[in-house]
């Protein structure tokens, strides 16, 4: 298993994160347990700022809350001078509950409800990322009723293929997100917002997908958008003050993922942005980014207790754990692959070929298939790396499983940031 950030093996042969023995964390908080390396989260934010602050560009970085959000993480984002990209009234409420600056929040979503729009306007968020023609009418009407004026980015789909999983590709022609440039819908969107009485169009947004290595797709999208922006300036006298290119920076889950440094990606994007603006005779807009997975993904680990070990001679050995697809859905949903280890026996030889099985009542509840670990014993602590993004945020109560606790660690100290759900929590809304 490749360790990230402060991850190391201590003198007892245990996995240690943030100066804290992970086995002691399981003893203290139980399992399953999510553990986040707070120092690594902060370091990732600073890597983005370091490159962009030297670029000569005006820029803004918004953390993509859908990857993982909780009050403590919002506080950290505030301290690291990050904005927030939220996609629901729940994420917005979470951010506002710790007095995050609403002007540094923007609201996404392909089907924003009237309640969400009204709540966002009342909260004075920085801007809406408009996703459809119907939404233009909705925001304009509700804004007029409330006496509020909204700022908006229009989300466009540039028709660029991202080489990633089908379910997390968002910038191609057939997408539920945004308005298409090629078929004229995006232009209709621009015209509709410019006509609106209660909306100011301040820029454009696109996002071609997630878990992307390299910048070929992003550069192609930037170039295409700038050609289109030149047409908009000539025909509609519209100039985008902001270009938000989303996120999607990939992380390393296994050796199959080819690492692509954030610094290299950002330098290439910045160069492309400047050259594209220059070639079209346009001013360089403010650059907005929305990293999520690349901020928290490698900082997160999930710890489980090993339970039943079942050998099917000549076929497979199943090592079952006390969690599963209720807290780790990405393997079942995407076929995602992960590295695993025994956190209490990190120095031992990976001699056994096994499949890690979750405890949910589904044959497809597998965490990792045909992986090597030391010969497992009941009570061992299994660790899955790189579970910081799209794990707790996608967790469910399937089989009425309790969602795990979440702990942040840093400088030898641990802090509970989300409590484990109780049995009472599972039924408190039932009548």
What are these regions (language model features)?
Residues 1-151, 187, 191, 195-200, ...:
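A charged N-terminal "starter" segment
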Residues 3-4, 159-308, 373, 410:
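Active-site loop/helix belt of alpha/beta enzymes
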Residues 20, 36-43, 68, 134, ...:
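Conserved active-site and cofactor/substrate-binding residues in soluble primary-metabolism enzymes
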Residues 64, 151-157, 205-207, 244-246, ...:
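Short beta-strand segments
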Residues 67-69, 90-91, 111-113, 132-134, ...:
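Active-site-proximal loop/turn and secondary-structure-junction residues that shape catalytic pockets
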Residues 74, 97, 117-122, 139-142, ...:
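Short acidic, glycine/serine/threonine-rich loops at helix termini
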Residues 83, 126, 150, 202, ...:
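The start of beta-strands in P-loop NTPase/AAA+ ATPase cores
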Residues 268, 274-277, 282-431:
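Charged (often Lys/Glu-rich) extended helix/loop segments that serve as interaction or gating elements
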